């Protein structure tokens, strides 16, 4: 779960690249729970998409959505999505304050929670570390983040490694290393 795969945001781009690549393996049944995504989105991709925004012209849903700031991140619709899709694994990769509510959801006992929280400073807030300890697995965007998680979480967190953001291989192509070395006069 993250921001909608079609948004021009860091989390949206990460969602697009990750879900597209997972889908191409043909190993997984995937669903995207898309923050800032409309309920009728997802017709352009081969995986299931659950939009988090309230349905247009549904005042009751809008009132619920607007009643709590965490609802923009999915807290108001998460359990309903889990009951419908019945995931084995819920993967999220956003800031701790965006996803820490997952720990207290009614459906939490029924899925494995894998989280890659943004860790770009040290120390992390103690309440976040306590939440990290309740995840089934933790990843980090960077080696620095992984080191912080391991040091602060000690044996309480299950840090499994880094999953640095990928690039779009159709846009960013590496230059041949030997050609660059020759052009720069590096032996």
Which role fits each region the language model picked out?
Residues 172-186:
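A short helix/loop element that forms part of the nucleotide-sugar donor recognition site in Leloir-type
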Residues 136-175:
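Donor nucleotide-sugar binding/catalytic pocket of nucleotide-sugar-dependent glycosyltransferases
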Residues 29-31, 113, 157-160:
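Hydrophobic anchor at the start of a short beta-strand
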Residues 1-41, 45, 85, 137:
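N-terminal subdomain of nucleotide-sugar transferases
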Residues 33, 50, 160-163:
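Hydrophobic residues at beta-strand termini and immediately following loops
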Residues 42-137, 143-147:
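Extended catalytic core of nucleotide-activated donor transferases of GT-like folds
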Residues 5-6, 37, 97, 120, ...:
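Short, glycine/serine-rich, charged loops/turns that create anion-binding
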